[in-house]
Every structure is written in structure tokens, then in C-alpha cells.
């Protein structure tokens, strides 16, 4: 797992982690046995993972683990210790940080056409984010 700490606002930061096949099977529809343990071993905390729909729906997480399994393509939060997860292959993960707000988006061509990135930024602004930093993750194409 590749882990990187990025600024999330004055005196705060967020950790980003990117996995590959060598880290195990993190698929939402993958084998349930051991999946929660694998997640906890990779990054501690209550995970919010999404059932990506290739659209522009954004989940706002107000407590640890809220929105787990929601049908959406982005999640945002101000909750310290929250783990927001999206899964990608040929789509691109985008991580946003700013002013104590973090967000993550699953960004494929359908989601981009639907407006997932502006929707994520708008939701973050509603939570108080001003200056934003966007980090583009890896994909297979």
C-alpha cells in the first residue's frame, strides 16, 4: 500500500492510501470473509466504502462508517479519523482536501459527464472548505 500525508487545512492533514493486487482483494463484492480484517490492517478506522454507480451522487459522512455501501461515486466528511474509500481500475480516484474537509471521488468518463467532480467540490464547500487541493490517484489506463 502506498500511503501519503497531504495538507487538509491549517494544522491538519489527511492520509491517502492506494492499494494494488498485492495488498489483497478489496472489491466491494469480493469475499466477505476477512475483508473487514484486511481493511483494518491496511488503514485503521471505520471505513465508508461506496457501491459506485458511475454517476454524480455524493455521500456526506457525519459519523465514522456512515454511508457504508451507499450507491454513490463520492464521499466527503469533516469527521476526524474517517476512512473514505473508492475502488478504481480504468476510472480515476480523486482525493480532495481543504480546511478540515476531505473528499474522495470515483471519476470515470460517465461520472465526469454526470458532474461528479463539481458535485464533490460543491458539497465540500457547503461543509466549509475554501482552498482545495486535489490529488489524482493511479488507474490502469
Please describe what each predicted stretch is:
Residues 1-141:
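Active-site microenvironment for binding and transforming phosphate-containing groups
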Amino acid at each position: 500500500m502506498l500511503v501519503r500525508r497531504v495538507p487538509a487545512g491549517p494544522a491538519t492533514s489527511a492520509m491517502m492510501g492506494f492499494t494494488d493486487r498485492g495488498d489483497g482483494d478489496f472489491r466491494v463484492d469480493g469475499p466477505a470473509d476477512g475483508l473487514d480484517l484486511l481493511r483494518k490492517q491496511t488503514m485503521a478506522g471505520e471505513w465508508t466504502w461506496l457501491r459506485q454507480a458511475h454517476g454524480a451522487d455524493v455521500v456526506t459522512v457525519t459519523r465514522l462508517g456512515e454511508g457504508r455501501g451507499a450507491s454513490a461515486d463520492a464521499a466527503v466528511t469533516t469527521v476526524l479519523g474517517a476512512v473514505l474509500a473508492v475502488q478504481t481500475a480504468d476510472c480515476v480516484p480523486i482525493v480532495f482536501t481543504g480546511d478540515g474537509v476531505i473528499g474522495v471521488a470515483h471519476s470515470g468518463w460517465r461520472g465526469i459527464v454526470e458532474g461528479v467532480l463539481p458535485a464533490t467540490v460543491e458539497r465540500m464547500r457547503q461543509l466549509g472548505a475554501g482552498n482545495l487541493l486535489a490529488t489524482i490517484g493511479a488507474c490502469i489506463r
